[in-house]
Amino acid sequence: MKPKPLLSRVKSENLPEDIRAAWDKSMSLRGDGTFFEVFAKHPELYRWYIEEFYGKVFQLGKVKNRYKQLLRLKLSTLHGCKFCNQGNRNDALESGLSQEQIENFENQNLDVFSKADLAVMDLAERLSMSNPNGTLDASLYSRLREHFCDAEIIELGFVGSILTGVAKFLFAFDLVEKEEYCPFK
């Protein structure tokens, strides 16, 4: 079901150029641009999210982008964000994840995923909204530490937490379409 937010929207023909470009891409991919129509009410915040969070932390940062794409897709899959999944799958494929890996998120076939991949996906499960008691315990820390330094583990945790918080915002404000299985109706 398409989102029906209470917040007002900016008509597509009145969107700022950068938000209009993102809206066009979303309409082509998803057939919905609600997120961009609403966020156009606060273009400075939208630009911070895209330029500062995505541009500097998510895309650059210390951790290889492939692992952040894996983390993001695992979170959006757990949360049931259809809007997110539609874009995140494409980005994950472009970052080097295989279609087979994406299709095996649930059973986490050890032949398909590396130990680093499995540790990142376990971290995503700890950070997800559906796991309010999730923590970085000694076992997971040890598994992550085999592949990442502390600065990289902090970055993965921070990125995952920001994405989880944004997902909560998107659902609470009804800005995106949800998967049928989404537990957050």
PLM features: residue spans?
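Preference for long, well-ordered alpha-helical segments
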Residues: 150-185
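Acidic/histidine-rich alpha-helical segments that form the ligand environment
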Residues: 116-158
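Acidic/His metal-coordination segments adjacent to aromatic residues that form catalytic metal sites
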Residues: 105-115
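Short, thiol/selenol-centered motifs that function as redox-active sites or metal-ligating centers
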Residues: 68-71, 75-89
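Iron-sulfur (Fe-S) cluster-binding segments and ferredoxin-like electron-carrier domains
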Residues: 85-103
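Mobile cap/lid helix-loop segments that border enzyme active or cofactor-binding sites
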Residues: 1-63, 93
